[in-house]
């Protein structure tokens, strides 16, 4: 009986691996057929569209930000686009983060001290422990430091300040507010206000939006007609003028 159970387990694993290999083969074939580097692919989208949305993988993933920083590091981004927006970060901290990213510091330690001081108040979560935020901001600072063309970062999440929160009840009231309950439209509203004020580059406004996969979808939320961020942007700025790029997704809870 134990042998039979073992054999069934081996067969199940083999079939699972075969299915995964089939899926992987499809991806490899597609990449070979397209024959275009990921960064060039995104810049090609910007040729005919003004807004490109990147559907971020799980917030804990760091490898995706290697790609994103390589994209921002490309001279074409600062010269032709110049603006990047993120889901993470309260909108009222936008001025502070750009001061951080364009500042001059005597040493790396001085920058890191300023970075961690800023991060303590960037978000409405008591602790945002995702290292890729440090990775992203530090990388963007290095890009700006080494280029005369600066990249501007826009933060799109709910307006929030820890200085205004004195009790648990006050925090709960914020967490239950419409702005938090309908974050997708909140983030879109904040984006649209900042986007309208962007300086023109080559006669146009271009923007890269980085938001988590569920928000980036061109769809409504299940069981409702409430738009996700991607769908809102497409309806606001035109289907062809907004392109959505989804990074491959992993269900961490099942791995």
Which residues fall in each region the model found?
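Bacterial Sec-dependent N-terminal signal peptides
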Residues: 1-23
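Structured catalytic-domain cores with a bias toward divalent-metal coordination
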Residues: 18-255
């Amino acid at each position: 009986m134990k042998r039979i159970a073992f054999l069934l387990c081996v067969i199940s694993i083999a079939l699972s691996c075969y299915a995964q290999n089939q899926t992987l083969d499809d991806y490899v074939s597609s990449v070979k057929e397209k024959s275009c580097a990921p960064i060039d692919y995104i810049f090609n989208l910007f040729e005919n569209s003004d807004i490109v949305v990147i559907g971020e993988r799980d917030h804990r993933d760091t490898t995706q930000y290697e790609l994103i920083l390589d994209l921002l590091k490309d001279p074409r981004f600062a010269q032709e686009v110049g603006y990047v927006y993120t889901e993470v970060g309260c909108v009222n901290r936008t001025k502070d983060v750009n001061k951080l990213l364009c500042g001059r510091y005597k040493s790396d330690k001085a920058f890191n001290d300023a970075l961690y001081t800023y991060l303590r108040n960037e978000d409405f979560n008591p602790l945002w422990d995702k290292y890729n935020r440090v990775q992203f901001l530090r990388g963007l600072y290095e890009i700006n430091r080494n280029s005369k063309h600066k990249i501007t970062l826009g933060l799109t999440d709910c307006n929030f300040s820890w200085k205004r929160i004195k009790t648990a009840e006050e925090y709960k009231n914020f967490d239950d507010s419409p702005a938090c309950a309908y974050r997708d439209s909140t983030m879109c509203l904040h984006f649209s206000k900042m986007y309208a004020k962007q300086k023109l580059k080559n006669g146009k406004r271009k923007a890269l939006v980085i938001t988590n996969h569920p928000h980036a979808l061109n769809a409504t939320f299940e069981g409702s007609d409430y738009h996700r961020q991607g769908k809102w942007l497409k309806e606001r700025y035109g289907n062809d003028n907004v392109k959505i790029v989804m990074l491959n997704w992993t269900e961490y809870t099942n791995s």
